[in-house]
């Protein structure tokens, strides 16, 4: 009853894709902190591209815009502490 000869189930991972390459109408802008928050952890760290699935070009743009938004206090440098 095993699905494969070794007894392990096969796990298929969905390929990550860059949502900005797929939909060119999505802007990456520091003035829109709601869209940038999806690329920041709850502790305030920028999510790496291997986790977020963005391409290198758009990851650099996201990082640049997050840093700009932090400079003018639209996004926090540090997340909320665990209490």
From Swiss-Prot:
It comes from the Bacteria. PROSITE patterns: RIBOSOMAL_S18. GO terms for cellular component: cytosolic small ribosomal subunit. The keyword RNA-binding applies. Keywords: Ribonucleoprotein, Ribosomal protein, RNA-binding, rRNA-binding. One of its GO terms (molecular function) is structural constituent of ribosome. The keyword Ribosomal protein applies. GO terms for biological process: translation. Part of the 30S ribosomal subunit. Forms a tight heterodimer with protein bS6. Belongs to the bacterial ribosomal protein bS18 family. Binds as a heterodimer with protein bS6 to the central domain of the 16S rRNA, where it helps stabilize the platform of the 30S subunit. PANTHER family: 30S RIBOSOMAL PROTEIN S18 (PTHR13479), SMALL RIBOSOMAL SUBUNIT PROTEIN BS18M (PTHR13479:SF40). HAMAP family: Ribosomal_bS18. This is Small ribosomal subunit protein bS18. The lineage of its organism: Bacteria, Pseudomonadati, Thermodesulfobacteriota, Desulfobacteria, Desulfobacterales. The gene is rpsR.
